């Protein structure tokens, strides 16, 4: 009985022990199975599928983006670089690796002059893992930073470069400028932006969870960018520099509001020099005023005044309604449609002569005579001649912002329009359009398209296209052109251009112009534009030269304020072309013979 009693309590304990052991085995087997599963899974993930999954994760971090091509350079006609792109870099900081924030900020501020120590210190203290602390940094600056070997500071090349302009003011109104990312904004940089910028490429780069590029990751090019074309301008840097200098002196001498000058090859239409005062430094375009950036040669339409009398003479001669022998009454005033027209009070009047021919009218710049010529030929002949010379149309010179000027249609003319248009009032034109018309007279009657672009050069430096002279149409006959050149020569030898437009050793020809400043449908009291346009040499012109001085003080007439600058430019251009002045013989005194 006692043995039976002792064995009875053991059975529940043994059962509990067996159950506990069973549970332990089950847990073991479950954990073992899970371990096997995890091990197998880990093997699959890390060994079998590892490379594939890593590649997929890498691809998820990749962004495919466009990147800019290298922007082309701008050269003058002789291959001198006026503008080119230099590589630029960004400066990044991995903030966690920067050991001395204050010292690093001070060191960087000594190189990145546009950043203050305080601003750099704040950037370096940001919680972001990396920050950009310098954008469009020059090669010299980035090299200097690299030499500092600052912990946490790295240099990363940028997709776009920085435009380098060696002579900041030279031809600034022609060249224009680009924005921060090399987008053309003005001048030929804007007009030919599509050629200069090239075709963008595609590349993949690593990005963070916010889509921002990781600066230190190596990008991979998918489609290579095509470098932009470089362009060769028709500009002659030597002429350009000196025309700017001469124009600046003239504007300052007469305390004028502004001025512009143009040198054109009449046989090809090439713009050899184009200057404006005031001007600006392309490298500091952001601080330049709109007036300083204005290209007056193509943008400013004005009443040409007496320089337009030659167009009236061209219309008269080419129509056959007036000949060189035709005589007009020499008088100082003429009343038409209730308006009295006077000759200019500049001392160049007809004197005691009772009649004058077309050459006299041009040489002495008589408004009344020009009005009589206009009335003789009629409005249709006058209008058609203006249109043949291209007035009222764009010249398509290749510069942005061109103004076509205003030539009213015949149905808009009043009773006084014909006589006033005949001496350059009641219409407007630009210096480039007027120079194109005079170039036609200089070259024998052909209207040439003026152009600023000479050639295209590919990324490897090969000239792939050279622009040829483009004849638009015949404006006048060669006979008429020759007669007009003789008239313009008379302006210099005995008219309003004497002696200011004379260049010793060379023959010059041209026309003076003086006009009131037209504004808001009327004329500004006391405000004038003095101009001179002509060519050299007179018999076989190589250069058409225009000088325009706006709102001068102390004198107003083109023969006074503009012709001397024309003469200086003409002499310079001829000598630069290798044409030496003709020898002017000194007076020889015959010795007295003894008798």
Give residue spans per PLM region.
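Periplasmic/cell-envelope proteins involved in peptidoglycan metabolism and beta-lactam response
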Residues: 1-285, 321, 325, 378-392, ...
